Amino acid sequence: EPPELIGSGRAVSKVNPDIISDSVNAANSVNSNVNILCGAGIMNDDDVKIALNLGSKGILIASGVIQSNNWEQKITELVSAFI
């Protein structure tokens, strides 16, 4: 999670996707049971889908929901990427 992207609305999955795939590869080389979570700038279901396609097993969210006008709808949108 690059600190400069936290709360920025700029998803690490789009700005620097190599961070996710490199982290997944590094973790798996040590222990294949480690699940990598992606955070920093996750704002929509597209950000989530990209993170999952890069090998992330889940996401961390805060500002993406808090800054939404309808947090229930935002959570539903983000969760839909897992289905």
Regions found by a protein language model. Give the residues of each.
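Glycine-rich phosphate-binding active-site loops on the catalytic face of alpha/beta enzymes
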Residues: 2-10, 52-75
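Glycine/Thr-rich beta-alpha phosphate-binding loop at enzyme active sites
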Residues: 2-24, 43, 74
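Alpha-helix-loop-beta-strand connector modules within alpha/beta enzyme cores
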Residues: 14-34, 78-83
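Extended, folded domain segments that form the structural surfaces/walls around functional sites
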Residues: 17, 22, 45-54, 65
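Catalytic cores of alpha/beta
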Residues: 30-59
